[in-house]
Amino acid sequence: MFIRAPNFGRKLLLTCIVAGVMIAILVSCLQFLVAWHKHEVKYDTLITDVQKYLDTYFADLKSTTDRLQPLTLDTCQQANPELTARAAFSMNVRTFVLVKDKKTFCSSATGEMDIPLNELIPALDINKNVDMAILPGTPMVPNKPAIVIWYRNPLLKNSGVFAALNLNLTPSLFYSSRQEDYDGVALIIGNTALSTFSSRLMNVNELTDMPVRETKIAGIPLTVRLYADDWTWNDVWYAFLLGGMSGTVVGLLCYYLMSVRMRPGREIMTAIKREQFYVAYQPVVDTQALRVTGLEVLLRWRHPVAGEIPPDAFINFAESQKMIVPLTQHLFELIARDAAELEKVLPVGVKFGINIAPDHLHSESFKADIQKLLTSLPAHHFQIVLEITERDMLKEQEATQLFAWLHSVGVEIAIDDFGTGHSALIYLERFTLDYLKIDRGFINAIGTETITSPVLDAVLTLAKRLNMLTVAEGVETPEQARWLSERGVNFMQGYWISRPLPLDDFVRWLKKPYTPQW
């Protein structure tokens, strides 16, 4: 019995909650980092796309105005048809205006005009090769802001072309349908800014927020700023949700694993109390007449949730948790419970092969457990054979005394899985043993030219010299059975004869005519 302090459950719960919270925080932080990186990549892509778009757009506009520069030598009447056509086929151009001797003299929108450029657009510097300004409106469209861009004629002083451009920022320039998580874009020319988040012109000093990206368009005095939140509500919600779920899962898993680790044998004891263990019996036959002369008793665990638990898994677990003794004691009780039914169908002298772990063999209760098992079985009907496997090193002196005592009370001893590395030749020299059980690995090699085959021959020769009876495990084919019979192996078991069966199925199997084909 394992005793824990009264606050064990509270400490365990607190530990698992702390672990869950720490994992939740860690996962949330990692998710924020992932979201931040995704936004960074997204903003880089967006600003690069914007820059490429504007570079291409203004390069095309420059090419168009270069074709219009010669028209500054003509009259408005001569220039107007081409000027109007160019404006019509240039994207987002409201109007092209020709300038000569610092005066505007022809517009694609209004025709002839005679207004000094510095009066019409004071912000433009006619002496620069390229200059830009943002206007609150134009004569033809007074309520909508526009960008004006000036291109000086390189061959004619104080002459050139300027264009008034529509500002259709969001759909045309910045693909807002693809960028649902940014706040807006601002175009900055000089000290004036026009943004998607305000309908009026702004002084650049009013843009107090830090942009996530900023780029200058080559060749023109235009700066583009991209504004966005560091995190969106979706980012925050998803990070906390993922962190919360991860923390919950880790907390529950921590509680389960720590419960198992800190309460040794709890599952085994619970399974014993709830009668989840049962016995399966695998018949052992003599190799000549194929009569049932014994059976190996195997413990099985049918878990209500996990189903059948593999024997290796729960036996290794029981050994690691120091629960192999109570588990074997429970096996003895199950055998005693089935004995009355087995007595009806099995002849006198049938052998019961039972696996015993070294920990149980050397335990204080071992002799009492064996005596209790013997007295619980029908008198003089069954022969108990204890199967020993070297999972741990046996204590030689103590084992010798125990084996002598077992023989004195009528219990026989078999060495199990011989030749697999679990057992050693030294056993055969130092201990008085009755049976040698040959591992299935050797049986599977029968009929194949492997190094295992001559080893099996040597094992059989050794057993005969020591006057030990031999039992072959894992016989699955008639060829293997025939080979073993011809080599003088005494007994065999395996799926060729029968798989391990629960009590009722084993009784039904015994009552059927047994005629295996050689």
Curated annotation (Swiss-Prot):
Its EC number is 3.1.4.52. Residues 261-514 form the EAL domain. It holds the Pfam family EAL. GO terms for cellular component: plasma membrane. It is a multi-pass membrane protein. Keywords: c-di-GMP, Cell inner membrane, Cell membrane, Hydrolase, Membrane, Transmembrane, Transmembrane helix. One of its GO terms (molecular function) is cyclic-guanylate-specific phosphodiesterase activity. The chain crosses the membrane at residues 16-36, 236-256. Induction: Expressed at both 28 and 37 degrees Celsius during exponential growth. Repressed by RpoS. It is found in: Cell inner membrane. Phosphodiesterase (PDE) that catalyzes the hydrolysis of cyclic-di-GMP (c-di-GMP) to 5'-pGpG. This is Probable cyclic di-GMP phosphodiesterase PdeN. It comes from Escherichia coli (strain K12).
